[in-house]
Amino acid sequence: MQHHGWLETYAQLAMPEKALVFRNHGFSGDKVDKRPRNRGFINPHDYLTISKADVILSFFGANEAWDKNPGNYKGILSKWVDETKGKQYNGKSAPRIVLFSPIAHENLDSPNLPDGKEQNKHLAAYATATAEVAKEKGVEYVDLFGPSQALYAKSGDTLTMNGIHLTNEGNNHLAQVIFKALFGKEAPTNHKHLEQTKAAVLDKNWHWFNRYRATDGNDVWGGRSGLRFVDGQSNKDSLFHELSMIDAMTASRDLVVHAAAKGKTIVADDSNVPAPIKVKSNVGGKSRSSNASKEGNVKYASPEETVKQLELAEGLEANVFASEKMFPEAINPVQLGVGPKGRLWGWTQPTYKRKMCRFYS
């Protein structure tokens, strides 16, 4: 849903007058009560408050099914529903909760992957447990296990990349199932504004994801967030402010989505994005975490000058085949590695520490 955007696209097209706002809070590997995060990461309830959630579409059970203990899962899910029903993330009322079952495991007939027959028994049990919790707690339930099996059976192409993670086409088909379950009608799959709206949704999702799952979260929330540099300025001081900047950028892209669903084209207006905090350089020994030895010389030698300084074994020769002068995009290299074909790969982050990453070979 985060990377393919089909469900939101269909919802926005079907109800353009509603100006719906979607925020994806999922991480790969999440369970109801175990969600791997950086130390200090904002807890799930507080993040739902940031998103001002009115409706929560909850997709649990697939990861828990590997534990093969649906009874325990049922108790944990029940507790989560109770806690969530007691919140007012939007500041006015308790959220409406919809529990979805896990999808089935697709048999890809691959010798390198399980066929899913055994796991589907566990997934079916977790789907049943989810349905029971929904009934007991008076919240809505949508079965995806049975419909996903039906999709696998009738599709001419595989709908998952590995049996459990949906492809773009798989997500498209499942989004149509979800849409019909939620709204009681067929998804607008042939809408004339579909491609424009989907592109706007994906751009908005990309901005949101850079806020929700910021690159190098250890500097934002974790153990390095409290490190202080010049005049006591910390990583958290600057990076938490950047999160608020991305919030504004994401909100402006909601407006682009809403316009696209109505067949209009607007450009995201980022004029209201707060100015970044000026980060003070630690060059010159001004920071408690820096010193002259650590900083070295900030005047970099040219590639040709560097080659002249190398001490090589007899018979060896060094030459420059790539540099920032030849390829300006290669600035800010983060990692280098040699691939199995003998090619040197470089990973750069032009906007370190977030948003843009590039690979070069």
What are these regions (language model features)?
Residues M1-G26, P44-K52, I56, L174:
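Serine-esterase "nucleophile elbow" of acetyl-processing enzymes
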